A protein has these predicted regions:
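Membrane-interface helix-loop junctions and terminal tails of multi-pass membrane proteins
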Residues: 1-121
Length: 121
């Protein structure tokens, strides 16, 4: 809404930008998977690099996926409230949040398999 105010737009809008294709859903799955896998891997291996790896993953998701990497349900809902190029139509939200949840779960499971915990509890 701050950006809307700066440009003299209505503070809350409903986006008309449909993002409902299967390809965009797959792109959102991939973007979320890569982001969460990057976070989990970096924190596990060397958390000093988190400030570099997370923005790199987000940038890659933006440039190299069909969804432009929302990768977060809160961002998805927020972007439904702008009719700018970055918006998402309200009817597309369910697909994106489902893809984000699936991507996050897949990244968590894969990282757990790749780097098993060796707890002796």
């Amino acid at each position: 809404t701050l950006a809307h105010a700066m440009f003299g737009l209505a503070l809350v809008q409903a986006s008309a930008h449909a993002r409902s294709s299967v390809g965009e859903g797959i792109g959102e799955f991939v973007a979320t998977f890569v982001l969460l896998f990057t976070i989990l891997g970096t924190v596990r291996r060397n958390s000093e690099f988190t400030a570099l790896t997370v923005p790199a993953a987000i940038t890659a998701g933006y440039w190299f996926t069909s969804s432009t990497s929302f990768a977060n349900p809160a961002i998805t809902v927020a972007r439904s409230l702008t009719d700018s190029f970055s918006g998402i139509a309200p009817e597309s939200i369910v697909l994106f949040i489902a893809a984000q949840c699936a991507g996050a779960l897949a990244a968590w499971l894969f990282s757990g398999w790749l780097w098993p915990s060796h707890s002796k509890d």
